[in-house]
Amino acid sequence: MTKFTINSENVKRLQTLSGQSKDLISLTKPIFCPSDGNLSVNLYSNRVTMSFSVDISAFETTDTGELNYFSMSIDEFNNTLATVSNGENDVLVEVDKDNNKVTFKNNTTGTKVSRAVYNAIVTLDEAKASVTAVDDMRDEYLKDPVTLKVTNEVSEFFETASKIMGLLKTQDAISLNGTSARYADQLVVINKTLSTSVSNTEVHLKRQLYEAIKPFLKITSELTVYLTPDFSIAFFESKDLGFKSILSLEKPKFAYPEDSDLEGALPQESSQVIVKTTKSALKDAFIPFNNTFKASPESWNWKKTDLDSSANNLAEGKWVLRYENYTGSAESVVPVTVVQNTEGANNGKLIVSIMVLEELLNIIPEDDLTITYNSLPSDTMYGALMKLDSDTVKACVTKYKP
């Protein structure tokens, strides 16, 4: 018989973590491993391994050690803790390997609840292997990791970033100069310099990564995210909660070279246009769109916005901001000053969502801004970089040839 006691404070933590884990990504199978005064919990799904440890106030076993490990479903464990303790009292846990069951007992009231062990008791070697899996994988894959520090201070920023990333992910067909083209996967990522440190991850930090980060921010003051150089796997770690997890990321359908950071993502010899304008001028340009389309917000699902940066327009010191959808069209002129234009007469149009521009303008502090976009040669698609003067916000958008 294996016995150990979880104090009330740690019961609350386990309830919180087990409840939150369901929001992270379908974590369904924990293994609890009482050993050396700690309770280690490992959660598994097809793509994620998550583990965290909780100090236990007492540990007693009559076993030799090889069968001190058992598994239950996360729902079953959480519900049992709630039934027996409600986080107010210590809980005694007894693992009966002979009868294949685990019993939770409230040490104050004596209330008992017994459960069958889910998926049978596992051996010491199997349990140890699962405990070290996260560290082993991190050591193997993170030779030169990309590190992202996320704190509660930047959670609001990630909310904005998620909206922008979600807006530009579409497979809808659009018409470009009489021809039909499809969005492969427009990526917009913003880096705001608060307590966030990002190197070459911008074009890869898609919505899936944000969605994985968001639940963690509810239960930890600081989260460290390590990404493999190819951005295929993300490792999450929280020191104050003591948990780690692994997330397998889908590779973007369109991305810049993996060995380049955002500033160097586009070749230096590529064409470049640098335009200066003001935030107020760009905001003023949105007025006709708001007036034209405010009666049919659902039409924003089929948006096409051109920042027409053709040579003639730039020569006249303007951008033409053009909006088209199934309900109509509208145009506005944005006064600009051309700082540099190496694209010449054949430069194309920058395709940017109006809502994305509005989101960008909402989070930059300065009125004057510089937008720089470089072209990445391709048969149908250019990459473009928008960099705002404050140096606190960067975005990567897709540009199409005319």
Q: What do these predicted ranges mean?
A:
Residues 122-141:
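Long, charge-dense
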